[in-house]
């Protein structure tokens, strides 16, 4: 979650974020996972971490830490 937050703060795209996650040895964002899908959609719409957390919370998903 920390790397996703940093990526959003840096204005990285979803593809760039997935590259960062892979380099760190973590799973990339996967659109068939509900939480990841919410993050991807909001990143594509240039939403902030706060806005993404609100969307995650509203859908009953864990927020970004």
Predicted regions and their residues:
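Histidine kinase transmitter module recognition
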Residues: 9-12, 44
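Short, basic-rich loop-to-helix N-cap that marks the start of a DNA-contacting helix
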Residues: 1-10
């Amino acid at each position: 979650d920390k790397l996703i937050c940093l990526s959003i703060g840096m204005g990285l795209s979803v593809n760039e974020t997935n590259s960062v996650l892979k380099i760190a040895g973590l799973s990339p964002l996967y659109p068939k996972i509900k939480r990841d899908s919410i993050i991807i959609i909001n990143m594509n719409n240039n939403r902030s971490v706060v806005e993404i957390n609100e969307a995650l919370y509203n859908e009953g998903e864990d927020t970004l830490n």
